[in-house]
Amino acid sequence: AVRGISNPAFLILMSNAEQFETHVAELEELYPGVPSIGCIGMSYQTSVTEKGVSVTAFEGVEAVTDVLEQASIMPVKYISRVEKALQKINASSENTVCIDFCTGNDAAVLTTMYSILEKKKISLTGGTGDGGKVSVNGTVYTDADVFAFVKNNGGKVRVYKENIYYPNPQYRFIASKTDRSKYTVGELNGKPARQAYQD
């Protein structure tokens, strides 16, 4: 996964649940002191990697990484880490983005992040990983959001989003047996959700 990576300025790790902690430690050993974030999840390049590992390396950038702990109850307690990281990198909306990986409760995390990012008009991209674990700079966390401010030293950078879904009036679903804390839907229109999607 790291073949050809020689002098990275920032690294993103995507691994599987069984090997995540091992891959985090190996990445830190191979590239000590290089800012990194990681999570459990799939990755895509020319094919989909579900049970393996992928590493994305950045050059020509500066990166500052940190963590918001206690994501499930009070990520705002660690908001000063976001502020300090922004100051350290001297972020600008023209050349800096924020990338984050969360273990869950992303609604509270996003509210916390946006309370700072909106002031500077810094874009955010990222997601919630699987398995309840994320990493930053070689340390694995549970119940946390790891983030990186990535500043392009040679130009601009932007985050774009596209909604690939569109309204379809012939379908209406009533969700039940939901768990808001885990963002799960048990049933749609009285059928198991998995079955409803397959139909």
Regions found by a protein language model. Give the residues of each.
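Small-residue-enriched flexible segments
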Residues: A1-F20, E26-L30, V34, C39-D199
